[in-house]
């Protein structure tokens, strides 16, 4: 029995990196063929099997190397073309895969960098008094603890060391020349130097301003490929966005001048539109509808006909001009996104061409049938077909051989990525119990594994979830009524916790932990089940010794979270299946854009702390005259990072946002503070949120079309329909997002290809 290759590398990104090498990590390559190569396809079956792609690329024969490269291309690992053509391919790839396996460390360090922003003591505290930030009630501060200066320096020092390793490790497999060709690497080194200088200045001579919070966010964007692609896409559409903003500004200037002149001698002009600057300010807020109809109440009292002016303004500004802006910027966004996807496809194609060249060692320009079958057999160590017979491999070969001459050219070979996305699924590592075949493959174990994988087991779990839901409803109702019977139902919920642990154990036993962990639903169930089970066990075992656990409220929230598993019931209902599947796919595709919004909030939060930090405090006489005081918004301030992020979220959803803008203008005594809030609106709301809304709409329609195609395939009794049905079943989340993007951008990608030709 051939041993399956175990995929131990860190999970790679979805799409390969752009041709200009905008990547988090790079690999290296050459056209070496290894010492175990064979002729046209014979002799390869006796080759040594390798557990990792890195070992296969470094030591394997040419089919093993090519299979590893094809698997990298399908996983979306971006290897720069210059590295692929390097003569130190095998050696460099060993370092490259070590870097990938350390991805958990690099990711954890990025998380630590952002977390530091939330834990740092605000810089304004040192300007007031040594213990200013200890008076949390006085300054309406958040509840997160602050690090001392020494603790912050130690924290920053550790993250800086790991960041240095992350940035300079690629030198081991790229080499100095290729490393410095990459613009992103140059920018990383520059920002790293600035960050180190900022830490030194903070250590020996603290200043009221630091650049470190902004650099941390910049590293987050540059090191996460999806965020970097979004940032590059947004930068590419800046010119178009500025053009439509200029058009909007002209409309606003003209409408404000018209309003100022029209209502000059009326109560509206005397109380609200007292000057052109004030009129412009109020009309801008009306453009966002945040002060509608408050701003034109005086005019409406004087004459009902005056409402026509404001109605026309709102209709033109909000429902025409804003949507026009959205249409223009989204069209530009799709064009820029198509460029990123096209460049990623080119990089993926270059990796496939490298794999083709490794197999075609004699330079014939094509692969014969035996060579393709040898490659597919090696590739099956990374990806799994439902059947691994030679007949299945020949079907794949027939799909590759589009010309029907039993020769696969480089162009035909490039379609292998699409074939893999349809025919193959990731091969999970074998279960550890495979080491004991006499037990694991006994008749009883085989029956148990078959039962756990059957629909009947799934129906039983759903029934248990429904019973658990009833128990939670009864227990919470009794808790509200302070009934003594609540204790009994808490014990019933404890029994349900044991049932879920048994369910989890049976699934891991039947599937193996690797296959179990590949499902996102199983990850959610695993974490939630163990958290609830451990919490409930400690609560019952030590009800009085652990004061935190004695409060069962937090467990109740987790129990309610467990009920989210009932969404699987919706997947059993045909009319809901497409909507639920579309929702989860959209969530995956939206994460990079939501990440950009989060990074924008982080940057503005750091800026807000350094501009407005410390000016909202109890006893400030100016504060009592502001809308923050009258609306009881004092907790929503920029005195520390957590409070600032919550405040910016309120501004993001446009909930009475002019209250903060006007209040901070009064507190600072300067109209320049308005720039902060207006720019935040233009970037976060008018640009980013509108893009997200438009993206969701188009992605939803595209995904629904794909789901309908999938349902049609299920009804197709032909061989082609059965093959497509199988493809629907084995698609991974990354593949589904990739298919969704290509479907959405099909017109743009076709146009780009035609221009290239």
From Swiss-Prot:
A GO CC annotation given for this chain: monoatomic ion channel complex
Annotated region described as Disordered, given as residue ranges: 24-48
SMART domains: EFh
Intramembrane spans: 271-285, 641-655
Keyword Transmembrane found: yes
InterPro entries (UniProt xref): EF-hand-dom_pair, EF_hand_dom, Ion_trans_dom, TPC1_plant, Volt_channel_dom_sf
Residues carrying sugar: 482
Tissue/organ expression: Expressed in shoot, mature leaf, cultured cells, and at lower level in roots.
Activity regulation field: Inhibited by the VDCC blocker verapamil in yeast cells. Channel activity may be down-regulated by cytosolic Ca(2+) in rice cells. Inhibited by Al(3+).
Residue stretches of biased makeup (Gly residues): 29-45
Transmembrane segments: 95-115, 153-173, 189-209, 211-228, 234-254, 309-329, 454-474, 494-514, 524-544, 554-571, 596-616, 677-697
Compartments where located: Membrane
Residue intervals annotated with topology Extracellular: 116-152, 210, 255-270, 286-308, 475-493, 545-553, 617-640, 656-676
Membrane topology, from the record: Multi-pass membrane protein
Cytoplasmic compartment spans: 1-94, 174-188, 229-233, 330-453, 515-523, 572-595, 698-757
A GO molecular-function descriptor: voltage-gated calcium channel activity
All copies of domain EF-hand, residue ranges: 347-382, 388-423
Keywords associated with the record: Calcium, Calcium channel, Calcium transport, Glycoprotein, Ion channel, Ion transport, Membrane, Plant defense, Repeat, Transmembrane, Transmembrane helix, Transport, Voltage-gated channel
Additional information: Rescues the Ca(2+) uptake activity in yeast mutant cch1. Plants overexpressing TPC1 display reduced growth rate and dwarf phenotype, and seedlings show greening of roots under light conditions. The highest overexpressor line shows most severe phenotype including a death symptom, possibly due to Ca(2+) accumulation to toxic level.
General function of this protein: May function as one of the major voltage-gated Ca(2+) channel (VDCC) across the plasma membrane. May be involved in the regulation of cytosolic Ca(2+) and in growth and development. Acts as the major ROS-responsive Ca(2+) channel and is the possible target of Al-dependent inhibition. Determines sensitivity to T.viride xylanase elicitor. Plays a regulatory role in elicitor-induced defense responses and hypersensitive cell death.
Complex and partners: Homodimer.
Record-stated family: Belongs to the calcium channel alpha-1 subunit (TC 1.A.1.11) family. Two pore calcium channel subfamily.
The protein's name: Two pore calcium channel protein 1
Protein's organism: Oryza sativa subsp. japonica (Rice)
């Amino acid at each position: 029995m051939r041993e399956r290759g175990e995929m131990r590398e860190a999970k790679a990104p979805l799409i390969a990196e752009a041709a200009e090498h905008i990547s988090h990590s790079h690999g290296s390559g050459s056209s070496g063929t290894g010492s175990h190569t064979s002729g046209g396809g014979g002799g390869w079956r006796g080759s040594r099997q390798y557990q990792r792609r890195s070992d296969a690329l470094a030591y394997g024969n040419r089919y093993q190397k090519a299979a590893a490269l094809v698997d990298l291309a399908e996983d979306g690992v971006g290897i720069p073309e210059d590295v692929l053509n390097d003569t130190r391919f095998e050696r460099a790839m060993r370092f490259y895969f070590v870097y990938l396996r350390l991805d958990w460390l690099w990711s954890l360090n990025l998380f630590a960098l952002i977390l530091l922003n939330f834990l740092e003591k605000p810089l304004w505290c040192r300007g007031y008094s040594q213990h200013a930030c200890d008076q949390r009630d006085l300054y309406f501060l958040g509840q997160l603890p602050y690090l001392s200066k020494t603790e912050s320096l130690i924290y920053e020092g550790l993250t800086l060391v790991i960041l240095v390793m992350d940035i300079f490790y690629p030198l081991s497999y790229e080499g100095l020349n290729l490393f410095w060709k990459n613009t992103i690497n140059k920018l990383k080194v520059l920002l790293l130097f600035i960050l180190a200088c900022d830490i030194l200045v903070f250590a020996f001579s603290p200043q009221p301003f630091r650049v470190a919070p902004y650099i941390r966010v910049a590293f987050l964007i540059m090191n996460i490929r999806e965020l970097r692609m979004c940032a590059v896409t947004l930068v590419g559409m800046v010119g178009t966005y500025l053009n439509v903003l200029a058009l909007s500004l002209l409309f606003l200037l003209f409408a404000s001048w018209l309003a100022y002149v029209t209502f000059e001698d009326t109560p509206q002009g005397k109380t609200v539109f007292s000057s052109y600057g004030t009129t412009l300010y109020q009309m801008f807020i009306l453009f966002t509808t945040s002060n509608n109809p408050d701003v034109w109440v005086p005019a409406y009292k004087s004459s009902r006909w005056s409402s026509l002016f404001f109605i026309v303004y709102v209709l033109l500004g909000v429902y025409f001009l804003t949507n026009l802006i959205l249409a223009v910027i989204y069209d530009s966004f799709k064009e820029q996104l198509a460029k990123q996807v096209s460049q990623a496809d080119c990089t993926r194609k270059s990796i496939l061409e490298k794999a083709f060249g490794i197999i075609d060692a004699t330079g014939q320009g094509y692969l014969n049938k035996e060579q393709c079958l040898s490659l597919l057999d090696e590739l099956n160590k990374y990806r799994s077909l439902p059947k691994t017979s030679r007949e299945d491999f020949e079907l794949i070969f027939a799909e590759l051989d589009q010309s029907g001459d039993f020769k696969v050219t480089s162009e035909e070979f490039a379609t292998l990525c699409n074939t893999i996305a349809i025919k193959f699924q990731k091969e999970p590592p074998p279960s550890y119990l495979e080491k004991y075949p006499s037990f694991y493959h006994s008749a009883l174990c085989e029956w148990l594994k078959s039962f756990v994988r059957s629909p009947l087991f799934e129906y039983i779990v759903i029934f248990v979830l429904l019973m658990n839901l009833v128990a939670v409803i009864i227990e919470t109702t009794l808790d509200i009524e302070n009934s003594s019977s609540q204790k009994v139902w808490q014990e019933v919920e404890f029994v349900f916790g044991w049932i879920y642990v048994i369910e989890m154990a049976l699934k891991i036993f039947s599937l193996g932990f690797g296959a179990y962990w590949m499902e996102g639903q199983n990850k959610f169930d695993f974490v939630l089940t163990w958290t609830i089970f451990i919490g409930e066990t400690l609560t019952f075992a030590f009800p009085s010794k652990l004061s935190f656990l004695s409060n069962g409220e937090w467990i109740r929230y987790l129990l309610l979270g467990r009920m989210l598993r009932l969404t699987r019931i919706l997947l059993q209902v045909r009319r809901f299946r497409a909507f639920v599947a579309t929702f989860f796919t959209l969530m995956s595709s939206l994460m990079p854009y939501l990440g950009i919004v989060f990074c924008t909030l982080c940057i503005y939060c750091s800026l807000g702390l350094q501009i407005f930090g410390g000016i909202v405090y109890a006893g400030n006489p100016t504060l009592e005259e502001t809308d923050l005081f009258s609306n009881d918004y004092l907790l929503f301030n920029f005195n520390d990072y957590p409070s600032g992020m919550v405040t910016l979220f309120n501004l993001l959803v446009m909930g009475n946002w002019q209250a903060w803008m006007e209040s901070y203008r009064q507190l600072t005594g300067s109209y320049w503070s308005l720039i902060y809030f207006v720019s935040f609106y233009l970037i976060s709301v008018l640009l980013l949120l509108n893009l997200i809304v438009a993206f969701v709409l188009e992605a939803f329609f595209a995904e629904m079309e794909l789901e309908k195609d999938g349902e049609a395939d299920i009804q197709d009794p032909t061989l082609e329909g059965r093959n497509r049905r199988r493809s629907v079943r084995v698609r991974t989340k990354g593949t589904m997002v990739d298919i969704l993007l290509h479907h959405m951008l099909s017109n743009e990608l076709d146009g780009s290809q035609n221009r290239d030709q």
